A protein has these predicted regions:
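A generic structural signal for short
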Residues: 6-7, 32, 108, 160, ...
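Aromatic-enriched alpha-helical interface/lid elements that frame and gate functional surfaces
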Residues: 170-227
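Secondary-structure boundary/capping positions in well-ordered alpha/beta enzyme cores
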Residues: 25-28, 54, 127, 203
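Active-site-adjacent "lid/gating" segments in soluble enzymes
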Residues: 38-188, 195
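Short alpha-helical functional segments enriched in proximate histidine and acidic residues
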Residues: 28, 119, 226
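A structured beta-alpha segment of the ubiquitous adenosine-cofactor-binding alpha/beta core
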Residues: 1-49
């Protein structure tokens, strides 16, 4: 039940085609920079006069207004503004991007989908459409909750590899093993950490799972020597 249509938005015919489609559509999603759709006569205010039930979703890097709104960007840029890249650095301390484009997929696509679905439910009840403004950098920052909570708790930005979810705890870390592989331990709950310590024959480390700072370093070294 899907169709692919190409419309030349620089032509009057293309704009007219979009207007005809909008009249029968439930959702319109656009990813132009702020102001482009208005110049084309296809912005939210114009489209809602054609279809009052329309859900109109704009996905941009930095939102519809503000000092960065007119900047182009990619996932890597949004991750940096959200503080994600600063938590995943390479050996020379350069911020890096993970293999998963989290700002594009989590900040953009997933956040948009959730907003659109909620707006569709509302439209079924109210008969009115909604405008949804998705800023990928903003949504990516909302996903960076562990680093934000650490900053609030400890009064500063956690160093790379020192956040509670990125290596800052012995019980939630990765360890090089004697056979040249890696062992990932995700044993935040006491019962799981206790079982792990018993399994590697280090029951003395059971109280050390949540050690931080220098104590954390000593506990991590002890575990690494055991695996």
């Amino acid at each position: 039940n899907k169709k692919s249509v190409t419309a030349d938005l620089k032509s009057a015919e293309g704009v007219a085609l979009v207007r005809r489609l909008v009249a029968e559509a439930d959702v319109l999603v656009e990813g132009f920079r702020p102001g482009v759709m208005a110049r084309l006569g296809l912005d939210w205010q114009a489209m809602r006069t054609i279809n009052p039930r329309l859900i109109y979703c704009s996905i941009t890097g930095y939102g519809q207004d503000g000092p960065l709104s007119q900047l182009a960007g990619h996932d890597y840029n949004y991750q940096c503004y959200a503080g994600i890249s600063g938590q995943t650095v390479v050996d020379d301390s350069r911020p890096t991007s993970g293999a998963v484009p989290i700002a594009d997929l989590g900040g953009g696509a997933l956040t948009s989908a959730v907003g659109i679905l909620a707006a569709l439910v509302d439209a079924q009840r109210s008969g009115q459409g909604r405008y949804i403004d998705i800023a990928m950098a903003d949504a990516a920052m909302a996903l960076n909750v562990a680093a934000l909570s650490s900053r609030a708790m400890f009064g500063g930005d956690p160093a790379p590899g020192r956040d509670i979810l990125s290596g800052g705890l012995p019980c939630y870390n990765s360890y090089a093993t004697a056979d040249g592989r890696h062992l990932v331990v995700a044993a935040i709950e006491p019962k799981f950490w206790q079982a792990f310590c018993v399994a590697v024959e280090r029951p003395d480390l059971i109280p050390r799972g949540w050690d931080m700072g220098p104590k954390r370093d000593a506990a991590v070294a002890a575990i690494a020597a055991s695996v």
